[in-house]
């Protein structure tokens, strides 16, 4: 499943590191199984992360992204609350995970 890690505490306006990962096969639709049958396409296409009602980071994933994608990015801690991350599959299925932060 998805994981999101941020510092537990930060000062208002402090730049922090947000680290995320999701366990996912990231199948391109090009690989064949042991019987020679094409494995169906199934990959994360979009990632977003919001904090305090603002988009902090977004990314489009393409076929070159390996399984279990990991992202690390910088963001400003604006207020106490959560960093809300969403991964969207090419099927439309969404995975969400949040991490709490206390801002002083």
PLM feature spans:
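Extracellular Ig-like/FN3 beta-sandwich strand-entry sites
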Residues: 15, 78-82
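Short acidic/polar inter-strand loop motif in beta-rich domains
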Residues: 88-97
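Contiguous segments within soluble domain cores/interaction surfaces
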Residues: 2-61, 66
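Short beta-strand edge segments in extracellular beta-sheet folds
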Residues: 100-104
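Short, aromatic- and glycine-rich surface loops/edge beta-strands on solvent-exposed regions
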Residues: 81-89
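Short strand-edge motifs at loop-to-beta-strand transitions and within beta-strands
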Residues: 69-73
